[in-house]
């Protein structure tokens, strides 16, 4: 099964919390803090694997979560770092942010790696907070939570030449005659149901990669037929070979077919429509009147398409000439990276300290309760001792530095209101 798009959820690992611990040894009466740091969370790393040609694996697995770092321990023991999660994808995979559809990365090189989400940083243990004036801190730093993202993986096969045309015009036959690819070939429409790639290695020319996609029909840009959903696989090509059935055995006009395909191409992508084209009149072995080809060639060249060839993929007549012309043109067209405009590029927002604040109005008592919730709050409270004055000062410092007090003031908090974080509640004093 050929799968070329997939939507998945990815999350990097949380950092482990720093430990609150003190030395307690029989002959060490003044032992001091010895809480170790938490380990960092594992990252989400995408890796290009040349042996993979489809996104089929992502049809069955939709969630990828890296390992979290372990919490720190006593005796200055550091928590173990979480294992990073490596996700293997085919070459030519584009990663998009699911909500905006903006591009995060283009993985188009052999062995390429991308650290998509870095793991959360481990929190510092209380030993790191000891000073000359605070020799026994009863607080530690919470680990930072990992990032999470819904993404869309989109595979665009990497080929130099794309074969274009209506169904049953001979694209698959040409691919099978010039490469070692074995596409399904039969005398009916839509025999090709997935893209096929092959390397053209004709004597005397530099080898190049050629892609055959399901045939395009009129109305494809509006979603009719099969070909439009695979056009993305020839978006990266440098050259198009546009094949028409010159024999007319199916009752179609080859020039009208040529016009219709180019109209659909232009609707889909102007950039793709502007790509150089070699026009091939295939099935010449079935042509009963040579004048039909000459008339077709004249009309096409009047439109500005100079390279027009007569060919029979079935008998191999004219095939070498087409392939050599393709190789010659490719020499003058540089390989381009995927062009991504600033508007198309996804820029992540800082989401590590996420929280929500809601208000409960207590009219009878004359004060409001501001409830602060979120993963950040949970982790912060787990790393402080609310019964210790120094620990509380550190706690309030974190709330201030992260903008929580500023947001409370913007929401209208007043002197005497209560602020609740999980089970811990304190009175707000201006």
From Swiss-Prot:
GO terms for cellular component: cytoplasm. Its EC number is 3.6.5.-. The keyword Cytoplasm applies. Keywords: Cytoplasm, GTP-binding, Hydrolase, Magnesium, Metal-binding, Nucleotide-binding. Residues 345-430 form the OCT domain. It holds the Pfam family MMR_HSR1. One of its GO terms (molecular function) is GTPase activity. Its main location: cytoplasm. It comes from the Bacteria. The keyword Protease does not apply. Residues 159-331 form the OBG-type G domain. It is found in: Cytoplasm. Mg(2+) binds at residues 172, 192. PROSITE patterns: G_OBG, GTP1_OBG, OBG, OCT. GO terms for biological process: ribosome biogenesis. CDD domains: Obg (cd01898). GTP binds at residues 165-172, 190-194, 212-215, 282-285, 312-314. Residues 1-158 form the Obg domain. Signal peptide: none annotated. Its cofactor is Mg(2+). Monomer. An essential GTPase which binds GTP, GDP and possibly (p)ppGpp with moderate affinity, with high nucleotide exchange rates and a fairly low GTP hydrolysis rate. Plays a role in control of the cell cycle, stress response, ribosome biogenesis and in those bacteria that undergo differentiation, in morphogenesis control. NCBIfam families: Obg_CgtA, Obg_CgtA_exten, PRK12296.1, PRK12297.1, PRK12299.1, small_GTP. Belongs to the TRAFAC class OBG-HflX-like GTPase superfamily. OBG GTPase family. This is GTPase Obg.
């Amino acid at each position: 099964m050929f799968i070329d798009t997939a939507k998945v959820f990815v999350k990097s690992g949380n950092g482990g919390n720093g430990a609150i611990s003190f030395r307690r040894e029989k002959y060490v009466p003044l032992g001091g803090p010895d809480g170790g740091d938490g380990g960092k969370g594992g990252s989400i790393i995408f890796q290009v694997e040349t042996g993979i040609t489809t996104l089929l694996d992502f049809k069955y697995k939709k969630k990828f979560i890296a390992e979290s770092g372990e919490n720190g321990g006593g005796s200055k023991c550091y928590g173990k770092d979480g294992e990073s999660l490596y996700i293997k994808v085919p070459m030519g995979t584009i990663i998009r942010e699911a909500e905006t559809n903006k591009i995060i990365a283009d993985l188009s090189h052999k062995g390429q790696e991308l650290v998509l989400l870095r793991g959360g940083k481990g929190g510092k243990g209380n030993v790191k907070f000891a000073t000359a004036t605070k020799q026994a801190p009863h607080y530690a730093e919470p680990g930072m939570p990992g990032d999470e993202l819904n993404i869309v993986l989109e595979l665009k096969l990497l080929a130099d030449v794309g074969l274009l045309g209506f169904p049953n015009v001979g694209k698959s036959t040409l691919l099978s005659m010039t490469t070692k690819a074995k596409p399904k070939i039969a005398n009916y429409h839509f025999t090709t149901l997935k893209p096929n790639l092959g390397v053209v290695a004709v004597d005397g020319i530099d080898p190049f990669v050629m892609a055959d996609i399901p045939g395009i029909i009129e109305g494809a840009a509006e979603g009719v037929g099969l070909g439009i959903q695979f056009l993305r696989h020839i978006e990266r090509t440098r050259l198009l070979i546009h094949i028409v059935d010159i024999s007319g055995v199916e009752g179609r006009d080859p020039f009208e077919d040529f016009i219709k395909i180019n109209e659909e191409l232009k609707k889909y992508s102007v950039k793709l429509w502007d790509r150089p084209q070699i026009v091939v009149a295939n099935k010449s072995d079935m042509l009963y009147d040579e004048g039909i080809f000459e008339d077709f060639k004249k009309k096409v060249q009047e439109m500005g398409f100079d390279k027009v060839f007569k060919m029979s993929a079935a008998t191999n007549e004219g095939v070498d000439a087409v392939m050599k012309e393709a190789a010659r043109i490719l020499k003058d067209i540089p390989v381009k990276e995927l062009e991504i405009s600033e508007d198309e590029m996804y820029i992540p927002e800082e989401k590590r300290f996420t929280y929500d604040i809601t208000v409960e109005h207590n009219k009878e008592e004359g004060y409001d309760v501001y409830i602060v919730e979120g993963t950040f709050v949970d982790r912060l409270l787990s790393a402080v001792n609310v019964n210790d004055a120094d620990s509380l000062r550190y706690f309030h410092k974190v709330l201030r530095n992260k903008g929580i007090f500023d947001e409370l003031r913007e929401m209208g908090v007043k002197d005497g209101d209560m602020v609740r974080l999980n089970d811990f509640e304190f009175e707000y004093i201006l």
